[in-house]
């Protein structure tokens, strides 16, 4: 079983602004979000298939608790409430599909994968994909 536990700092980010654009976030809010999310701090606790993930930026902190294979509620990148289901895509990668609780929007998901001592986080909105690479602190 892979060990996602630890504190992580972001090393690189690709397509975050494009992702927010695909989610319908206006230009002013995108500018603030991109600046605020430029140095997120991520804490992950793991007990087998049970995960706690806390992501902190200068303007927002999110926390999720979930068990792989069981549905849970969280928020999309742009703050809309959704029902999510995380599954193991392979032995080192979790894939989570999100379904909005209200309204319409693009199909969203996230993945977290361990590879070469890095945590690779992807967010997707329809065909737009944002990739963020983290290293352990």
UniProtKB/Swiss-Prot annotation:
Assigned keywords, A-Z: Cytoplasm, Retinol-binding, Transport, Vitamin A
Residues reported in the UniProt entry to bind all-trans-retinoate: 132-134
GO molecular function: fatty acid binding; retinal binding; retinoic acid binding; retinoid binding; retinol binding
Coiled-coil residues: none
Subcellular location: Cytoplasm
GO biological process assignments: fatty acid transport; signal transduction
GO cellular component: cytosol; nucleus
Motif (Nuclear localization signal): 21-31
Cytoplasm among keywords: yes
Domain comment (free text): Forms a beta-barrel structure that accommodates hydrophobic ligands in its interior.
Family: Belongs to the calycin superfamily. Fatty-acid binding protein (FABP) family.
General function of this protein: Cytosolic CRABPs may regulate the access of retinoic acid to the nuclear retinoic acid receptors.
Protein's name in the database: Cellular retinoic acid-binding protein 1
């Amino acid at each position: 079983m892979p060990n996602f536990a630890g504190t992580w700092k972001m090393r690189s980010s690709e397509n975050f602004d494009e992702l927010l654009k695909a989610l319908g976030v206006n230009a002013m809010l995108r500018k603030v979000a991109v600046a605020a999310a430029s140095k997120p701090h991520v804490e992950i606790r793991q007990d087998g298939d049970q995960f706690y993930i806390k992501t902190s930026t200068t303007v927002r902190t999110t926390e999720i608790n979930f068990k792989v294979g069981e549905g849970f509620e969280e928020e999309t990148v742009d703050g809309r409430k959704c029902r999510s289901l995380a599954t193991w895509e392979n032995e080192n990668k979790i894939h989570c599909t999100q379904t909005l609780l209200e309204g319409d929007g693009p199909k969203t998901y996230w993945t977290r994968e361990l590879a070469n001592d890095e945590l690779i986080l992807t967010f997707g909105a329809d065909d737009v994909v944002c990739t963020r690479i983290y290293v352990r602190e």
